[in-house]
Amino acid sequence: MSYKHLISACIFSSLCLGQVNAVLAEDKLPPSNTSTGQHSELSVDNDNLWQRLLRNISLAWDSPNQELYIPLNTWHNRWTYDDDKIESYNERPWGIGYGKYRYDENNNWHAVYAMAFMDSHNEVEPIIGYGYQKMWIPAEMDGWRFGVGFTASITARHEYHYIPIPLPLPLISIEYNKFSLQTTYIPGTYNNGNVLFTWMRWQF
C-alpha cells in the first residue's frame, strides 16, 4: 500500500470534480443577448435527459449538505472465480470519500462524490461520479429510508495505467437518519469483475 498513491488519487479526484464544477458554472450562464427569464423558459421547453442530468449535478454540487464515505467490503462472487484467485484478492478495502448531496421535492437522493480506496490487488483506485436514488420512506418506520438508483461514474485502475474509465452502475441503500449502507454490483466475466462493493455513508 502506498500513501503517495492514495494522496495522488485524492488530488486527481478533486481536480476532476473541480473541472466538472467549472463546466457546470459555464452551462448555467445565459447567453449575453438573452434575459434570465427567457433563458429559464428555454431551459424548461428544451429540457432533455442530458440537461436534466447536468442540472441535478449542479444542484447537488451547490448544496450545503455533505457526506463522508467509508469503503467496507468488496465481495467477489464465488460462482465466477477460481479459489486461488479469491485467496489472492483483497476484500477489506480501506479508503475514504467525500460527497455533496440533496433530497429533491420527491425525497429522492442526488449526490456528487469522490472516493479513493485499495482495490482487489491492493492498488489505489479513485472514483468520481453522480449518484441518484429513488427513495421509499415507510410511514410506520420513522427515520428509515430505502433507495434504488444508479451512479454515473469515472474510475481509473493501476493495471490500465490509470486511464479514466466510464463506469455506470446500479445503487441500492438502506438508510437510518444520517447513516447509510450503500452498495453496487460490478458485472464482469469469469475471474474478472462480478464484485459486490459496499460502503458506509454519513451525512453531516
UniProtKB/Swiss-Prot annotation:
Superkingdom of the organism of origin: Bacteria
Organism lineage: Bacteria, Pseudomonadati, Pseudomonadota, Gammaproteobacteria, Enterobacterales
Alphabetically ordered keywords of this record: Acyltransferase, Cell outer membrane, Membrane, Signal, Transferase
Gene3D superfamilies the record matches: 2.40.160.20
Protein name from the UniProt record: Lipid A acyltransferase PagP
Compartments it resides in: Cell outer membrane
Function, as annotated: Transfers a fatty acid residue from the sn-1 position of a phospholipid to the N-linked hydroxyfatty acid chain on the proximal unit of lipid A or its precursors.
Principal location listed in the UniProt entry: membrane
NCBIfam families from the UniProt entry: PRK11045.1
Induction: Induced during magnesium-deficient conditions.
Keyword Membrane attached: yes
GO cellular component: cell outer membrane
Transmembrane segment boundaries: none
One Gene Ontology term from the biological process aspect of the record: lipid A biosynthetic process
